[in-house]
UniProtKB/Swiss-Prot annotation:
Protein's recorded name: Phosphopentomutase
Gene Ontology annotations for the cellular component aspect, listed alphabetically: cytosol
CDD domains assigned to the protein according to its UniProt record, in alphabetical order: PPM
Essential cofactor(s): Mn(2+)
Entry similarity comment: Belongs to the phosphopentomutase family.
Chief localisation class: cytoplasm
Organism: Bacillus anthracis
Keyword Signal part of the UniProt annotation: no
Catalytic activity: 2-deoxy-alpha-D-ribose 1-phosphate = 2-deoxy-D-ribose 5-phosphate; alpha-D-ribose 1-phosphate = D-ribose 5-phosphate
Family annotation (InterPro entries): Alkaline_phosphatase_core_sf (IPR017850), DeoB (IPR010045), Metalloenzyme (IPR006124), Phosphopentomutase_DeoB_cap_sf (IPR024052)
Note describing how the cofactor binds: Binds 2 manganese ions.
Stored Pfam families: Metalloenzyme
Binding site for Mn(2+) 1: 13, 327-328
Pathway: Carbohydrate degradation; 2-deoxy-D-ribose 1-phosphate degradation; D-glyceraldehyde 3-phosphate and acetaldehyde from 2-deoxy-alpha-D-ribose 1-phosphate: step 1/2
Length: 394
């Protein structure tokens, strides 16, 4: 008999809670995503996260301890050697990653692009982080006139290649992306995903077509999600979760346009009758505010998210468990534009916790979440991680 019929796992992308013990190795001494945002905002207003025990993990401006938190609380340390989205999420589901994925806030190295040009016979333009629509406005006409390839990246570990379908036929674009995929498996580059981004139209009126194709990496081993799916449990992936795991172990995928859309979708899954895992990633914190070093926007987004939690609390049943965490930090007042190596919060709540919660021991790996989910549903335990299921008292 499962202790919980449904587990709702929410990853607040990049919401770190202070430098990790090994932060110095990553150039991240002093990083503190929530703490610095709270300072910048002169106090964060997150009453619902506070009720769950956020301030009991650590007090910050506007975020204080409560005498009787509703849930269990602690923080988790990442064991893997990266600080990117894929590494964090893969570890959450029971894997240990010793080769970090790379992000390219300054664009890709010249030697990689030289090799790509040589192997494809086409010049490369762009080579910077950009929004897909903006880069077409900027370089689409040049791409059409010259037959070159627009290469760009984003805040994540991706290499995207855009070309007009009438200039570079789809088959050729896909071949080019396969070449890029091979080149970027090298540990120096280690790109999580290569994406073909074909477009059509005329200058000033370009549109991306549905012929996008992703060349992703599958997780380097079986995750708890694979075990759940193979045991006929539901695994509902919301937001970019399905992409992060390349669809592995996913039974249903719900795309989202924003954090608020993500919260709408999680409320939708709360209304569904299923047995298994609902897994949500809220990417806006990271993509719109962390990388752009916008502490004000980040703080407002955190408060907006917090204001949606009562809808979740209201619909949670006695045999549901809500787990809230993050996958890495991205301190918007830290130098540079990259993620930061931080502890992440962990909050666990169920309406069945009548006595409220208490502090859990510090987690030595994000994989403790995967182990807890696996133990709850009686599936094969991951190689890494220690379950805290029995510490959650009803």
């Amino acid at each position: 008999m499962n202790k919980y019929k449904r587990i709702f796992l929410v990853v607040m992308d990049s919401v770190g809670i202070g430098e990790a013990p090994d932060a110095e190795q990553f150039g991240d001494l002093g990083s503190d995503t929530i703490g610095h945002i709270a300072e910048h905002m002169n106090g964060l207003h997150m009453p619902n996260m506070v009720k769950l025990g956020l301030g009991n993990i650590r007090e910050m401006k506007g975020i204080s301890k409560v005498e009787k938190p509703l849930g269990y609380y602690t923080k988790m340390q990442e064991k893997s050697t990266g600080k990117d989205t894929m590494t964090g999420h893969w570890e959450i589901m029971g894997l240990y990653i010793d080769t970090p994925f790379q992000v390219f806030p300054e664009g890709f190295p010249k030697e990689l692009l030289d090799e790509l040009e040589e192997k494809t016979g086409r010049k490369i333009i762009g080579n910077k982080p950009a929004s897909g629509t903006e880069i077409l406005d900027e370089l689409g006409q040049e791409q059409m006139e010259t037959g070159s390839l627009i290469v760009y990246t984003s805040a994540d570990s991706v290499l995207q290649i855009a070309a007009h379908e009438e200039v570079v036929p789809l088959d050729e674009l896909y071949k080019i992306c396969k070449i890029a995929r091979e080149l970027t498996l090298d540990e120096k580059y280690m790109v999580g995903r290569v994406i073909a981004r074909p477009f059509v139209g005329e200058p000033g009126n370009f549109t991306r077509t549905p012929n996008r194709h992703d060349y992703a990496l599958k997780p380097f081993g079986r995750t708890v999600m694979n075990e759940l799916k193979d045991s006929d449990y539901d695994v509902i992936a919301i937001g970019k979760i399905s992409d992060i795991y390349d669809g592995e172990g996913v039974t249903e995928s719900l795309r989202t346009k924003s954090n608020m859309d993500g919260m709408d979708k999680v409320v939708d899954t709360l209304n569904m009758d299923f047995t298994g895992l609902s897994f949500l990633n809220l990417v806006d914190f990271d993509a719109l505010f962390g990388h752009r070093r916008d502490p004000q926007g980040y703080g407002e987004a955190l408060q907006e998210y917090d204001a949606r939690l009562p809808e979740v609390f209201e619909k949670l049943k006695e045999d549901d468990l809500l787990l809230i965490t993050a996958d890495h930090g991205n301190d918007p007042v830290h130098h540079g534009t990259d993620h930061t190596r931080e502890y992440v919060p962990l909050l666990a709540y169920s309406p069945s916790m009548k006595e409220g919660g208490q502090e859990l021991p510090l987690r030595q790996t994000f994989a403790d979440i995967g182990a807890t989910v696996a133990e709850n549903f009686g599936v094969k335990m991951p190689e890494y991680g220690t379950s805290f299921l029995n510490e959650l008292k009803k």
